[in-house]
Amino acid sequence: MSIEDFRNHCLSLKEVSEEMPFDKSKNDYAHNILMVSIDNKWFCLVNIEVFYCCILKSSRNVSTNLQAEYDAVHPAYHMNHRHWISVFFNQDMPNSHIIEHVDEAYHHVLSSLPKYECDKLA
């Protein structure tokens, strides 16, 4: 999977926006982080220059199960380990499953929005 394919899939989800929140950072790695969100609630982070993993919002149960099933899934570095996972590309998780979990992260955040926000997005 390429960064273009990954980004295009993320942006194909309804009412999604992207941002480079750390673009003023002096740290080269942080400078290239693309944040994908719905209603300013993050659900995915990925480095567009060093495309080796993505960080996804996840429920604790899903996170625990994925970490047990795949070597490619770890608690997300510098994020709350109960709510975020790192998924490494080109390991034992097929790209199709990674895309499914991007969608799951999107729906996880969407379901946490207040009803009036969800109604605006419908």
PLM features per residue range, with description:
Residues 1-122:
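Charge-dense, helix-prone N-terminal extensions
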